[in-house]
Swiss-Prot record:
This is RNA-binding protein Hfq. Belongs to the Hfq family. It comes from Histophilus somni (strain 129Pt). GO terms for molecular function: RNA binding. Residues 9-68 form the Sm domain. One of its GO terms (cellular component) is cytosol.
Length: 96
C-alpha cells in the first residue's frame, strides 16, 4: 500500500463499514450523495438510487453526514504495517 493512502483507505473503509451517508463534491462543483459501497486505488462506488462509479481524481471533498471513528482503523493499519516490516527485517537477518 502506498504511504499516501495510509489515512485515505482506513477512513473510506470506516465510512463504508458503518454505512455513513456521504456528500462527495467533485472538482467541477457537482455534489453527489449516497453511501460508499466499495473503493479501490482509483474509484469510489457510491450507492444511492443507482450505483455511481466516481473517479477519485475528480473528487474534491468527501463530507460524512456524521463523524466517523477511523482512529482505530488507522492504528490497526499502523500496527499491521509495523509487524510486516519486522517480519521482513527478521527474514533479511536470517538470510545473512
Amino acid at each position: 500500500m502506498a504511504k499516501g493512502q495510509s489515512l485515505q483507505d482506513p477512513y473510506l473503509n470506516a465510512l463504508r463499514r458503518e454505512r455513513i451517508p456521504v456528500s462527495i463534491y467533485l472538482v467541477n462543483g457537482i455534489k453527489l450523495q449516497g453511501q460508499i459501497e466499495s473503493f479501490d486505488q482509483f474509484v469510489i462506488l457510491l450507492k444511492n438510487t443507482v450505483n455511481q462509479m466516481v473517479y477519485k481524481h475528480a473528487i474534491s471533498t468527501v463530507v460524512p453526514a456524521r463523524s466517523v471513528s477511523h482512529h482505530n482503523s488507522v492504528q490497526h493499519h499502523h500496527i499491521v504495517q509495523t509487524q510486516e516490516m519486522q517480519v521482513e527485517a527478521l527474514a533479511e537477518n536470517q538470510t545473512e
